[in-house]
Amino acid sequence: MHVTHRKRFVSRDLVALAARRPQELAALSEAHYHDQIESIADEVLAAGQRIVMLTGPSAAGKTTSAHKIADAIAARGHRSQVISLDDFYIGEGKYPKNPDGSDDYESLEALDLERLHACLKALYKTGACDAPVFDFTIQRPSGIQCIDARDGVVIIEGLHALNPALTEELPEDAALCLYAGLREEYADSRDARCLATRDIRLARRLVRDYLFRGHGAAFTLGLWGHVCAGEDRYIKPYKPRANLLLDTTHTYEVCLWRTVLDTMPADPALTATQARQLAALREKFAAFPALGTELVPQNSMLREFIGK
């Protein structure tokens, strides 16, 4: 069975009203996400498939979500592990090229498909495999991770996880497909959309890139168009294959991003166009009340973006 991923509109005024009781708004937002994690863990085990393929767009929180689902499965007494498709990159000097001559890391051909197919077949047949570990500092595979899901589940997460080319050598029902994305968009007093899910993901990405990857806003905004094009090309066409959906929206986060974006230092590398883009994004979040990150629990998925 496949499910349909539909957006839902939330009134900006309703968020403003709820933000008058910030602790309750945060708690409800967190509970909405964590209840889904628990439910998905139950559904995965009930389905009986050993392999779960999980995808979602950039900054949807798919990596953290994959590990939270794995933890929930483990808490139910079943072995669980997570494999990132990034570990199957073919390595420097072997990547396909973009039209401008740069390496294309988002193409399916950037992955070692032969090795990936071998791992998936081994997982399906025996429940175990030796998967590569990719070292990004030297841009090539370095080491092996032993995957053992003989009495449990392995979650494989990444950009191309729902692409049928990955599982074409397995029986059709060998893997359960899961899509993680944001469902909440926000409407103004005229019921017109004033904040889209892609805006929220961009805010998440800007903050994470700055705090953990050493990149200013110019770098993130410079890549964002390519990132979105890659999502449209490599993720959206396969979204209908999803058996399960995970909404990673946290309603109160729109109030957090207003605060965090306003406190990020200026990036002198911004072009005039990027400066206008960032100003427009900040203006969208400025329509919401400001809340501080101290509201965010230490076990929140949002900590992937703001840190501990």
PLM feature spans:
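Charged, amphipathic alpha-helical linker segments immediately N-terminal to NTP-binding catalytic cores
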Residues: M1-S39
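Conserved NTP phosphate-binding and transfer environment spanning the P-loop NTPase/kinase superfamily
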Residues: K7, P22, A27, P164-K308
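Glycine-rich phosphate-binding loop used to anchor ATP phosphates in small-molecule kinases
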Residues: A46-G48, H117-D173, T220-Y238, E253
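Post-Walker A helix-loop "phosphate-sensing" segment adjacent to the P-loop in P-loop NTPases
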Residues: D71-Q81
